[in-house]
């Protein structure tokens, strides 16, 4: 898969997005578009903590990439009026790395750990007393004479973000006071996000042009902002700078993004299941090998949206293309695939 395709439809943050995401990031809950139930519950928790003069309860945010987990963590810090320290699971390799971070926190500070599911179990164990008792247990000495020393930590808030909720251990999950799932955004919310971003970036666009971008954005704000930039470029070079419905449609067609936001790789995944494996069920690892892609990338980037559209089903024997997928790809639907199922299934994937 080319870097351009990855950059366009992936909900994951890439280098080109970082500066733009910061400039477009809302700074308070009322400006955060969508996720109403989450915002309401989070707003109550923040106000209650501020009124009591306490640190906010630990928060876990989970869902597909690009939906606003990092943005929400910054908003929480701004709403609480505290500092935020940002790190990620892969960056914390040893217990000492986490201990150094924890001991440098100030009262009520926020520690944001992205990809928290990638913490090792040894590192995770340091978090248990830190989250529950605001304490850090360290071992002093070695061998039979070693003893445990408990250091007090300031009251702080841990915000964990993950795309793999099921990979978190139960002891870690249980220590979060608030757990919120971010869902894909509906078209109206994405349209509002694209309109807001266009205004901030000074992009000229009519409502029909914005609609063309919104309906292809996979329900993901990060993808919407990325497509807006690419369509802006096309309008500047091929048109008069104004994003109209025709300009947006032409631009996105050139980028091989269809009317539902599916790109070449999405089509390849579905067509591989249909043409090579009789529509499925077929294991994830087999699909990955067939299209020369990593299984984790399919699972994190492509599969959630295909499931959301109802184009893909997860079964005990693997992934299966649905009737809707056949219709979208204009492929005749075959009802009788029993002979194929026995040939191409894998357990558990």
UniProtKB/Swiss-Prot annotation:
Residues 186-256 are annotated as: Small ATPAse domain (RuvB-S). One of its GO terms (cellular component) is cytoplasm. This is Holliday junction branch migration complex subunit RuvB. Keywords: ATP-binding, Cytoplasm, DNA damage, DNA recombination, DNA repair, DNA-binding, Hydrolase, Nucleotide-binding. Pfam families: AAA_lid_4 (PF17864), RuvB_C (PF05491), RuvB_N (PF05496). It catalyses: ATP + H2O = ADP + phosphate + H(+). Homohexamer. Forms an RuvA(8)-RuvB(12)-Holliday junction (HJ) complex. HJ DNA is sandwiched between 2 RuvA tetramers; dsDNA enters through RuvA and exits via RuvB. An RuvB hexamer assembles on each DNA strand where it exits the tetramer. Each RuvB hexamer is contacted by two RuvA subunits (via domain III) on 2 adjacent RuvB subunits; this complex drives branch migration. In the full resolvosome a probable DNA-RuvA(4)-RuvB(12)-RuvC(2) complex forms which resolves the HJ. GO terms for molecular function: ATP binding; ATP hydrolysis activity; four-way junction DNA binding; four-way junction helicase activity. CDD domains: AAA.
């Amino acid at each position: 898969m080319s870097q351009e395709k990855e950059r366009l439809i992936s909900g994951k943050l890439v280098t080109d997005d970082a500066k733009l995401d910061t400039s477009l990031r809302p700074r308070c809950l009322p400006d955060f578009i969508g996720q109403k139930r989450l915002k309401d519950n989070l707003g109550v928790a923040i106000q209650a903590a501020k009124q009591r003069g306490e640190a906010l309860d630990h928060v876990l945010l989970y869902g597909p990439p690009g939906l606003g987990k990092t943005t929400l963590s910054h908003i929480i810090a701004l709403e609480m009026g505290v500092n935020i320290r940002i790190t990620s699971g892969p960056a914390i390799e040893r217990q000492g790395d986490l201990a150094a971070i924890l001991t440098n926190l100030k009262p009520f500070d926020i520690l944001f750990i992205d990809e928290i599911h990638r913490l090792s179990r040894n590192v995770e164990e340091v978090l248990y007393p830190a989250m529950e008792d605001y304490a850090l247990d360290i071992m002093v000495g070695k061998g039979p004479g070693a003893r445990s020393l408990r250091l007090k930590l300031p009251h702080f808030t841990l915000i964990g973000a993950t795309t793999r909720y099921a990979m978190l251990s139960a002891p870690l999950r249980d220590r979060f006071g608030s757990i919120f799932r971010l869902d894909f955004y509906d078209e109206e919310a994405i349209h509002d996000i694209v309109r807001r971003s266009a205004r901030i970036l000074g992009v000229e666009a009519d409502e029909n042009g914005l609609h063309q971008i919104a309906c292809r954005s996979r329900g993901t704000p990060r993808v919407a902002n990325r497509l807006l930039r690419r369509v802006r470029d096309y309008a500047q070079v091929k048109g008069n700078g104004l994003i109209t419905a025709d300009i947006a449609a032409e631009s996105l067609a050139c980028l091989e993004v269809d009317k539902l936001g599916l790109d070449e790789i999405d089509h390849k995944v579905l067509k591989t299941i249909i043409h090579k494996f009789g529509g499925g069920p077929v294991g994830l690892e087999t699909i990955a090998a067939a299209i020369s892609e990593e299984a984790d990338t399919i699972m994190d980037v492509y599969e959630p949206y295909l499931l959301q559209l109802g184009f893909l089903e997860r079964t005990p024997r693997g992934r299966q293309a649905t009737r809707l997928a056949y219709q979208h790809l204009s492929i005749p639907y075959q009802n009788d695939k029993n002979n194929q199922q026995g040939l191409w299934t894998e357990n558990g994937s």
